[in-house]
Amino acid sequence: GPVIDQCFNPTTRRLQKSRVPIIAAVNGVAAGAGASIVMACDIAIAAPNASFIQAFSKIGLIPDAGGSWLLVERLGLARAMALAMTGDKLSAAQAKEWGMIWDVAEDCVAAAVAMAERLAVMPTRALTATRHLMRDAGSRTLDQQLDVERDTQSALGRTHDYFEGVKAFLDKRSPQFKGE
């Protein structure tokens, strides 16, 4: 009830609706809502000792914080169903192999910071648009997605960052994006 409505669900919704990419670093066990919140992030990097578990079935509950939707979205129905029903633990290596997380790194925090620094110098409007296109793709048909891609590409093709990216490529130098 109240904890789900006041804490977990608003957190998952905020992560899903964010304008900027969300990066998670996981060191240890991400259980229940913790695992769901990791899956709500755009990029997750885990330490080798990290694991993910949805053990709700072992105590007579169901996945929360979006877990029932996020597991299916990330892993597919068969894997999501088995994990939710058995409460089995998923290792970091298996989570990477199955597509739950992006990578496994000895120092997951340093790797997450490095990823954030890498994204910070990229064309932020394009990253935001890519994030929204990917997040919303499942609710559209292919024809609808093609139209949204066309419209988004057209808008981004008139930005400073696009012109800077093309010029930098032609000049054989690194681009200096401004988010404009």
Question: What is each PLM-predicted segment?
Answer:
Residues 1-26, 74, 157:
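An acidic, glycine-rich surface segment that forms the CoA-thioester-binding/catalytic face
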Residues 5, 9, 32, 62-65, ...:
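Glycine-rich phosphate-binding loop at the start of an alpha helix
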Residues 16-24, 39, 49-100, 116-119:
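Conserved catalytic cores of soluble enzyme domains
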Residues 24, 28-34:
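Gly/Ser-rich catalytic serine loop of serine hydrolases
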Residues 32-33, 50-55, 108:
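Short glycine/proline-centered loop/turn elements that form peptide/ligand docking sites
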Residues 33, 39-40:
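Left-handed beta-helix
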Residues 37-38, 95, 112, 169:
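Hydrophobic/aromatic residues within transmembrane alpha-helices
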Residues 45-50, 96-147, 154-160, 176-180:
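C-terminal long alpha-helix characteristic of the crotonase
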